Amino acid sequence: MRKVVLMSLAVFTLLSCATKKEIIYFQDSNSLNNTEIQKAFEPIIEPNDILHISISSFDDSLVAPFNKEKFAENNASSDNLALQGYLVNSEGNINFPVLGAIAVAGKSRSEIENLLRTKLMEYITDVVVDVRILNFKVTILGEVANPGVYTIRNERVTVPEALGLAGDLTDDGNRNNISIIREENGKRIVTKLDLTKSDIFTSNFFFLKQNDVIYVEPSLRGVKKSGFIPDIPALLSLVTVILSAVIIITR
């Protein structure tokens, strides 16, 4: 009987603890030494993006017809973004002053800057064009400290950086099965990433795109805590107590 109790305690201990391999990130990180860093990431413009386009020149009067009215920084709420910027319509175009409809979907920011610069040089020889995405955001759900929607100001964010913004995974987050949900070319794509391995750094999903969704599913321990499946360690603990009582009574 005592052997049964000891075995139950051993199993209880094993099932109650997360293993080191389940918790530590990038466990084969030594393989990253001297590896080439991916080229600078630049997001591709999509329908429903809102672009901030700034046109400047030595002569302010020349660029005035091409610039929208500037809003105060404290008025830059989500409701005012469309007023401050140019909404990319379902056809992938923006309606730009004087120039009319400009096709921007499928282009990078630098490509749009070059396109507008070429067109505007007919009016302004020293024109400078700057394009930014106003509504670049990612959504982080599941087993993280602070789930929510995060606006990315510099339009460049990696999976580890985004999870850092959300306060990192909880202890109950499954680190080897992170879901990235992305809409691309009218289709929804879902991929899985393993944070315990360093090959995440070479994944096409390492850099997040606007409107990406990260979902961190609960680990087995997290599912047990939710009550959807029996808590085996708790059951074993109960059995151990009962067996211990039986031993004491039958002595």
Q: What is each stretch, according to the model?
A:
Residues 2, 17-251:
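Ser/Thr/Pro/Gly-biased, low-complexity, turn-/loop-rich segments
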